[in-house]
Amino acid sequence: MSSPLECAKYLLSAHTTHQLPADDGSEVAFAGRSNAGKSSVLNTLTRQNALARVSKTPGRTQQLVYFTVTPQRYLVDLPGYGYAKVPKELQIHWQTFIDSYFHQRQALRGLVVVMDIRHPLKEYDLQMLAYARQRGLPAQALLTKADKLGRGQQAQTLQKVRNELTKHFADHINIQTFSSKSRQGVEQLHTVIETWLGLARLA
């Protein structure tokens, strides 16, 4: 059976909260530092190579990008963060926008925080997970580019990050490895997101 996420289509890009769709559906947001592989995750999940643009210049995503899965069910690509070439004023605008989104958006059903498995749990990652915790939302910590490490190193990093997350958030954050290249962890993430959005598998 194919995943309903494969039906995703671009809907809109929003620079302010006023441009967001009506707040009466269900949506899952994807957050991550610039160059963590967020666009590749979205493209892999949907089996669409060009759904989310993979920029050669990290930090270019300057808005919330909405993709429609089914009517009133969305995937949301949040602005990448933490890249030095982005002007300070723009970083402040993003932060204000993201703060407002997390505190006001009732349609939000869950958060996927994308982290490069070689550089996990930066300050921004913890901040995003804290947002989810404060709202009582489920969150999935995604250790991407897992193919860059051997199985032993993957397991070691996974356990280390799990211990750190437990210290900060008790057992409220789920964690998994993921690779767009080998498709490792794709089915696991499909299941998580489909459950959050209340989607049924397509025969």
From Swiss-Prot:
Query: Which residues are GTP-binding?
Result: 32-39, 59-63, 77-80, 144-147, 178-180
Query: What Pfam families does UniProt report for this protein, alphabetically?
Result: MMR_HSR1
What is one cellular component GO term in this UniProt entry?
A: cytosol
Q: Which UniProt keywords apply?
A: Cell cycle, Cell division, GTP-binding, Magnesium, Metal-binding, Nucleotide-binding, Septation
Going by the entry's taxonomy, the superkingdom of the source organism is recorded as Bacteria
Q: Does the keyword Methyltransferase apply?
A: no
Residue positions annotated to bind Mg(2+) are 39, 61
Keyword Electron transport present in the record's keywords: the answer is: no
Q: Name one GO molecular function term.
A: GTP binding
Q: Tell me which Gene Ontology terms the entry assigns under biological process.
A: division septum assembly
Q: Which residues form a coiled coil?
A: none
Report domain EngB-type G positions.
24-199
InterPro entries found in the cross-reference section: G_ENGB_dom, GTP-bd, GTP-bd_ribosome_bio_YsxC, P-loop_NTPase
Q: Which cofactor does it need?
A: Mg(2+)
Write out the function statement from the record.
Answer: Necessary for normal cell division and for the maintenance of normal septation.
Name the family: Belongs to the TRAFAC class TrmE-Era-EngA-EngB-Septin-like GTPase superfamily. EngB GTPase family.
Q: Which PANTHER family match?
A: ENGB-TYPE G DOMAIN-CONTAINING PROTEIN (PTHR11649:SF13), MSS1/TRME-RELATED GTP-BINDING PROTEIN (PTHR11649)
Query: How is this protein named in the record?
Result: Probable GTP-binding protein EngB
Natural source organism: Xylella fastidiosa (strain 9a5c)
Specify the taxonomic lineage. Answer: Bacteria, Pseudomonadati, Pseudomonadota, Gammaproteobacteria, Lysobacterales
Provide the gene name from the record.
engB
